[in-house]
């Protein structure tokens, strides 16, 4: 399958690395890496399979848990002004965070992903070459920590 016949995208001033081949290669590695899910068993390609037109062929998507929506194809997604069936996201970068943090999809949090990214030397080098120094996981840890329910005292 090829998507090379799509028209060239208009410039995106919010994406400083959008035209860099190294950024695309790094993104492709992350897309297929199941290490970026809570269970380390679900990659973006688990639901957006290139051999299934970047969908999963299921009525309802399944990641680390269950979801209540069908997986949208990624073909042509860069041309959309809105993302998700209900249009709740208006940019690809903001949309991309949602499945990573959704309990039924990838099920993680930003601190977990920074830690995992930093733990793979090739990823650490790729990140640094594109964006500079990685975020300090300790400094931002409290902001990225998952919210947990707290019971009432007895």
Predicted regions and their residues:
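Periplasmic c-type cytochrome electron-transfer domains
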Residues: 1-154
């Amino acid at each position: 399958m090829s998507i090379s016949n799509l028209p060239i995208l208009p410039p995106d001033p919010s994406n400083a690395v959008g035209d860099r081949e190294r950024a695309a290669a790094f993104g492709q590695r992350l897309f297929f890496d199941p290490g970026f899910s809570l269970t380390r068993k679900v990659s973006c390609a688990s639901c957006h399979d290139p051999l299934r037109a970047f969908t999963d062929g299921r009525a309802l998507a399944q990641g680390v848990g269950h979801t209540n929506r069908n997986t949208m194809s990624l073909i042509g997604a860069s041309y959309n002004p809105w993302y998700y069936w209900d249009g709740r996201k208006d940019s690809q970068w903001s949309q991309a965070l949602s499945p990573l943090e959704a309990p039924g999809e990838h099920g993680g949090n930003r601190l977990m992903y920074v830690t995992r990214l930093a733990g793979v030397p090739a990823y650490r080098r790729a990140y640094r070459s594109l964006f500079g120094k990685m975020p300090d996981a300790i400094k931002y840890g409290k902001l990225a920590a998952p919210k947990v329910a707290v019971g009432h005292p007895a």
